[in-house]
UniProtKB/Swiss-Prot annotation:
Record note on quaternary structure: Homodimer.
Protein name from the UniProt record: Hypoxanthine/guanine phosphoribosyltransferase
Pfam families: Pribosyltran (PF00156)
EC number: 2.4.2.8
GO CC annotation terms, alphabetical: cytoplasm
Keywords annotated in UniProt: Cytoplasm, Glycosyltransferase, Purine salvage, Transferase
Catalytic activity: IMP + diphosphate = hypoxanthine + 5-phospho-alpha-D-ribose 1-diphosphate; GMP + diphosphate = guanine + 5-phospho-alpha-D-ribose 1-diphosphate
Predominant localisation class: cytoplasm
UniProt GO MF annotations: guanine phosphoribosyltransferase activity; hypoxanthine phosphoribosyltransferase activity
Source organism (scientific name): Methanothrix thermoacetophila (strain DSM 6194 / JCM 14653 / NBRC 101360 / PT)
Highest taxon listed in the record's lineage: Archaea
Protein function: Catalyzes a salvage reaction resulting in the formation of IMP that is energically less costly than de novo synthesis.
SUPFAM superfamilies with a match to the protein in the record: PRTase-like
Subcellular location: Cytoplasm
Length: 190
């Protein structure tokens, strides 16, 4: 399973950003192009492994959008996108996001108390974004039924789970300064 995803990860170029070996991939960057068969494979796998007894799908701008959008289209579950822009709407929650290479603010709107949600995203590296999003969802009164991230890298997924949040991943990758050298399919980590 996930042969298209695995093959595409092995083909991903890598560059150094500070001390971080950053791989460039259609799921994580939208570059060079995002093929429909790749998104289809990812979304079909999410449907197989996720608890979709939810009111809303939640994702983060930008690279969670292709995954969350496709999942929403297939399941008819509404999509909430956590944005990088503040809108100032009533109930908006500011989220401090820390990734493997940057810090920023993102903004959650469209979640009501009692909403049952699934969080989907492209990659978890440090776990900073996922933990911040889960805390914001809890602050909004949402019930986090599940979380699925396509690519697991580093110790971030374990950090998320250790913080008490659900998280399933699809593949785990290891990257050095030249290439993605290991892609391992994950069987039902939650």
């Amino acid at each position: 399973m996930l042969e298209i995803l695995k093959r595409s990860l092995y083909d991903a170029p890598v560059f150094k950003r500070g001390d971080y070996n950053y791989f460039i991939h259609p799921i994580t960057d939208g570059v060079p192009e995002t093929r429909p068969e790749l998104i289809r494979e990812v979304v079909c796998h999410i449907i197989r492994i996720a608890d979709l007894d939810v009111d809303k799908i939640v994702t983060v701008e930008a690279m969670g959008i292709p995954i969350g959008g496709a999942l929403s289209l297939v399941t008819d579950i509404p999509l909430v996108i956590i944005r990088k822009k503040m809108y100032g709407l009533p109930g908006e929650i500011e989220v401090s996001q820390v990734t493997g290479y940057s810090k920023s603010k993102i903004y959650l709107n469209g979640i009501k108390k009692g909403d049952r949600v699934i969080f989907v995203d492209d990659v978890v590296s440090t776990g900073g974004t996922a933990i911040a999003v889960m805390k914001a969802l809890e602050a909004a009164g949402a019930v986090i039924r599940d979380a699925v991230v396509v690519i697991e890298r580093g110790a971030g997924a374990e950090r998320v789970r250790s913080a008490g949040y659900p998280l399933k991943t699809m593949v785990k990758v290891d990257v050095d300064e030249k290439r993605v050298f290991r892609v391992e399919e994950v069987s039902f980590r939650s």
